[in-house]
Structures are given as C-alpha cells and as structure tokens.
Amino acid sequence: MIRAMPSQDSIRAEVREWVKGAWDPSLSLRAWRERLVESGWAVPSWPEQWYGKGLPPWADEVVRGEIQRCGAVATVPAGLAGPTILEQGPDFMRERFLRPLLTGEEVWCQLFSEPSAGSDLAGLTTSAVLDGDEWVVNGQKVWNTSAHHADLGMFLARTDWDVPKHSGITYFVLPMKQPGVEVRPLRQMNFHASFNEVFLSDARIPKDWVVGEVNKGWTAAQATLAHERHFGALSAARFEGIDDGPALQEARAEAAEVAKVYAWYPQRAGRVDLVVEHAKATGANRDPIVRQEIARLLSMHRASSWTAERARAARATGRPPGPEGSIGKLALSNVARQAAKVHAMIAGAHAMLAGADPASPLGGVIAEVLISVPAQSIAGGTDEIQHNIIGDRALGLPREPDPAKGLPYREARNY
C-alpha cells in the first residue's frame, strides 16, 4: 500500500505538537538530542529504523525551522559520516555509530588526503594489513579538520597493491584515541590552524569496521565526497528565539568551538558583502573601471547563488548529489578570485597591510582575504578536479589518456 506523502503544513503541525510535550529548556544538550533522536525528528529524511521518519529530503529544513520556531535547539551533528554510513555501511555500523554521532557523544573527522595524494586521491599509499582480528595501519594523512578532538575518523587505506589503484582501497572507521595515532596542527599562511596532519604508526582497526567491502572503498569514498561538495557551504547554527537554558548555552558553546576552525572562511570566500560599502567609503566607486569590476563580481555572485539553489532543489526532490556540487564549487572559486581582485583595486597597496597596522583597510580583513582566497580553489577538490568531474560525469567527455590505467598499483605508482 502506498502511503500518502504529508504536506509541509501537516509536518509542521506534528512537530509543534511533539515539541510542546518534549522540549524543556532545563535539559542538557545531550539529553535534548537523545529525545530528538528517539523521536525521529533529528533527521526526518532518514529511514524510520535509523532514527528518522522516512520523509523526503526537503523535510529536514522544514522540521529544523519549526523546532526552532517552537523555541527549541534544532542543530544535530550528522556531518558527512552520518549519510555515508547510512548509505554504505552495514547494519551493525548503523547501530553502533549513528546514534552517538547524532547526539554529539562522538566527534568525527575525515582522513582521506595524503601529502602525495590530494587531487589524485586514489594514489594514496597509507596501508592497512590484516593481522588476526585487526587491521594494522601505517602512513600519513593531511588537511584533516577536527582531527585534534575527534573520536573516530572516516579513513581510506590501501589494502591491495596488486590491483589497479581504485580497486585496492578500503574505507574504514578509525578509532582516533589510540597510541598509534599522532595529530599535529598545520599553521597556514593566514596565521590560522584549521587543519591537522595525522601520523599512523601501527594503529589498529577492528576487522569488521569496514564501510562497504574490502578493496571496494572507492565507491563509499565517492559518496562522502559528493556530500562534501553538495554541502560545502558552511551553515552557521541559528539560535534566535530559542528558550534560554543549559541546552541553548551548550549549543552556543559547541557552535563557538566549531566556528574557531572556520573563522577565516568568510575571508576565503572573498567577503563580497564588504565590497560596495568599502568602495563608497574610499571613493573608489567613482572610478568607472572599478565600478565595472564590481558589477562583474555582483553578477557572478548572484549566478553562484542560483547554482546553490539548483543544488538545494535537487536535494529537495531526493535526487542524489549531481554535477551542481562541482559547478557550484567552481562558481565560488571564481567569485572569490574576482572579489580579491576588486578588494585590491579599491585598497591599492594598503590591501597587504595586516590588522596590527593602523593603516590596514577594514582592520586587516582585506589582507586576510588576499592570502585566504587561494584556498577556495584547493580545499574540497581543486578546480581542475571539478572540471574533470563535470567533463566526465555530466558531459560524457573522454578522459585524459592514462598510460598506467589497468596496471597493478605496485607498478602504476612508478609512472
């Protein structure tokens, strides 16, 4: 029997009724999230057996908005691990990991890139060798956000060197709190330290902590990366109108801790919001060339927002992440570069003065923009990789010739 899909209004009414009986401002954040998870309203688009309601993807935003309008905390840390394990993991993993992930009891990080395997992620060389009931892991990962306080990691390692490179990779869940895992912060040229490098020396993973199948982890990795591109824009937690109490205070503290890592992300995106007023304040808006470049920037920014809307609309219909993610990321990179160009035109040589200098424009924000924008074209997959994804998967263009294609990775890595 086909069940009729509820309307947004009926979903909102049901959420309001539930929150009325369940929300208590005196609850701790963990206790409140336990209630959310148990009710299915934490991630309503997930299946009912896995803490959801079996609703369409658009219901997630509808429910979060209604929970907040009722004065309750609506944020739940599903991250990238949640949808990946839900889609690709076995049932015992869903039972073991999804609930503590949603309640915030366990923090996750992503351990994919390596010093010599960033854009060519399938060229990774971190190894995992089965030893009885455990995998023994050795190697190095890099550009790992949140690794310094994570409990678990989404982790890729090579488990077979005698097959083509994409075929010998396995996707694991790595316990981070063990002697064989060393995490070191990476200091960036904009003086932030948002990422880490992780050194693995005989670290151990339970034999069955494999997402998908052994040697077939590339499929699961693609699912994670698709979600990363699709949800690449950081959404700030919203707390307006929420009843004061322990849950709100803890949610604010949690959001503030997460935000430390991303404090420079607005600068990485180019700070388009500052351009017009800055041009007016300096008189640069009287220059027709500057005005032309500002108009170009604002047009690009508007087009980029439409691409983001397309991605959201695709998700609302339940369609898996498609080329909109890569197209949107490219658009954001182009906007950021154009914004940096315009900021430099407006501020001139003063654009390079840091915040400590009294002559620095906007307290050094422009200088931080100029040295942060290059990251927009690298993080989460370089512009070149996005072009390849669009050409290959969306346009059906032939791939670049690869003389090592089909060779065992033990041989192919020498090309």
Segments (PLM) and residue ranges:
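A short, Trp-centered hydrophobic/proline-enriched beta-strand micro-motif
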Residues: 104-112, 154-156
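C-terminal helix-coil-helix/basic helical segment that borders enzyme active sites and/or dimer interfaces
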Residues: 24-27, 280, 284, 288-291, ...
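Glycine-rich beta->alpha junctions and the first turn(s) of the following alpha-helix
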Residues: 181-302, 376, 412-415
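Glycine-rich phosphate/cofactor-binding loops in nucleotide/flavin-utilizing enzymes
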Residues: 11, 58, 62-63, 80, ...
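Internal helix-loop-helix
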Residues: 38-105, 146-152, 301, 308, ...
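Amphipathic, small/basic residue-rich leader segments at the start of a protein or domain
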Residues: 1-78, 86, 96-100, 246, ...
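A structural signal for short hydrophobic beta-strand segments in well-ordered beta-sheet cores
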Residues: 126-129
